[in-house]
Amino acid sequence: MLTSIRHNYRLSAIITPTTAAQADTLNAGPSFGDFVAPDAPLSPAEAYEIKTVQVGPEGRKKTITRLPEWLKTPIPSNANYKKIKKDLRGLNLHTVCEEAKCPNISDCWGGSDKSAATATIMLGGDTCTRGCRFCSVKTSKAPPPLDPHEPENTAEALSRWGLGYVVLTIVDRDDLADGGARHAMETIMKIKQKAPSMLVEALVGDYAGDAEMVKLVANSGLDVFAHNVETTEALTPYVRDRRANFKQSLNVLRIAKETKPELITKTSIMLGLGETEDELWKALKDLRANDVDVVTFGQYMRPTKKHMAVHEYVTPDVFEMWRQRALDMGFLYCASGPLVRSSYKAGEAFIENVIKKRRMGRGGQVGGAQIAEMEKSA
């Protein structure tokens, strides 16, 4: 009898009726459908409509915004996705895809063949010394020491996957005298030793403005030097860590280009942070003045409630407008869309084509017809 009473007590403790406030909270949270694209395409009017829902107890309800339809993505699956994840765990490697909660992980990791799959390896560990208000990567003033095996393990993993184009993201390491530049250089050199034909893009920090460290990475053998300005100059103090500034980022990109002119230089800007049209125009002009080749635009998506709020969800039409404006200004390539991120597969395919054509001696600049042709293949 005592056993029965205890059993019933446990059940009653577990099966507790949901209160109205709890039900509201659950109903307003992400549903299964929030992460899965709908089967039937919506009309533009339906797709672009921002939906809201009221949550909270009576008398204290508040309105929150639902995720727009154009930001919904498939759940990660497929054999390539599982293989990449297994290899990463086995070699104790990290990816920005996971750490930054990228919405494109199912698309990039789940490519139908090896050449289509992409994973962005994060070097320097999984902890950054900067605390930008948009970023979900862990942060600390004193992160763990660098893993001396990371360069070799990274090169080994990438050689297993047989990819044609890889992306490395290096966390800021202000705790190190060289900012982690030599670690990045060693990794790139080992990748090129194991796979000479593999194209390497490295997304690096600003190395606190140290030009010698920028030159070190630029001369390491990489093909694409990426450094993100992230937002407009006016918003930089509110969005990025206080040690970062817009002009310093421009200098990093300029120094890399001057060090090795054949390098493709690349940067990314988030939209939806409250930037104005004039601020964006100025940012693009400044980037072109510093000979930046590639720019990408993507929607800022708030990782957690601790991060800065989304000011607006920018529609696909506006992203397309900025893509065309960037191309008209002379950028070699522009990927622009709500789900575009700095490491974006279609952009990588395009850049890969450009580098191969340059290696074959077909000229450094790409005309409008070539751009259209290569965008189709990407």
Swiss-Prot record:
Q: Name one Pfam family in it.
A: LIAS_N
The cellular location(s) given in this protein's UniProt record come to:
Mitochondrion
Cofactor: how bound? Binds 2 [4Fe-4S] clusters per subunit. One cluster is coordinated with 3 cysteines and an exchangeable S-adenosyl-L-methionine.
Query: Does the keyword S-adenosyl-L-methionine feature in the UniProt annotation?
Result: yes
Q: Which residues bind [4Fe-4S] cluster 2?
A: 128, 132, 135
EC numbers? 2.8.1.8
Positions annotated to bind [4Fe-4S] cluster 1: 97, 102, 108, 343
Q: Which reaction does it catalyse?
A: [[Fe-S] cluster scaffold protein carrying a second [4Fe-4S](2+) cluster] + N(6)-octanoyl-L-lysyl-[protein] + 2 oxidized [2Fe-2S]-[ferredoxin] + 2 S-adenosyl-L-methionine + 4 H(+) = [[Fe-S] cluster scaffold protein] + N(6)-[(R)-dihydrolipoyl]-L-lysyl-[protein] + 4 Fe(3+) + 2 hydrogen sulfide + 2 5'-deoxyadenosine + 2 L-methionine + 2 reduced [2Fe-2S]-[ferredoxin]
What UniProt keywords are attached to this protein's entry?
4Fe-4S, Iron, Iron-sulfur, Metal-binding, Mitochondrion, S-adenosyl-L-methionine, Transferase
Q: Which cofactor does this sequence's record say it needs?
A: [4Fe-4S] cluster
Domain spans labelled Radical SAM core? 111-332
> Which PROSITE patterns does the record match to this protein?
RADICAL_SAM
Q: State any GO BP term from the record.
A: lipoate biosynthetic process
Question: Do you know which SMART domains this protein is assigned to?
Answer: Elp3
Recorded GO molecular functions are: 4 iron, 4 sulfur cluster binding; lipoate synthase activity; metal ion binding
Question: What's a GO cellular component annotated to this UniProt protein?
Answer: mitochondrion
Give coiled-coil spans as residue ranges: none
The main location class comes to mitochondrion
Pathway note? Protein modification; protein lipoylation via endogenous pathway; protein N(6)-(lipoyl)lysine from octanoyl-[acyl-carrier-protein]: step 2/2
Top EC group: transferase
InterPro entries, from UniProt?
Aldolase_TIM, Elp3/MiaA/NifB-like_rSAM, LIAS_N, Lipoyl_synth, rSAM
Q: Which HAMAP family match?
A: Lipoyl_synth
Tell me which family the UniProt entry assigns to this protein: Belongs to the radical SAM superfamily. Lipoyl synthase family.
Look up the further comments and give them: This protein may be expected to contain an N-terminal transit peptide but none has been predicted.
Protein name, per record: Lipoyl synthase, mitochondrial
Q: Which organism is it from?
A: Phaeosphaeria nodorum (strain SN15 / ATCC MYA-4574 / FGSC 10173)
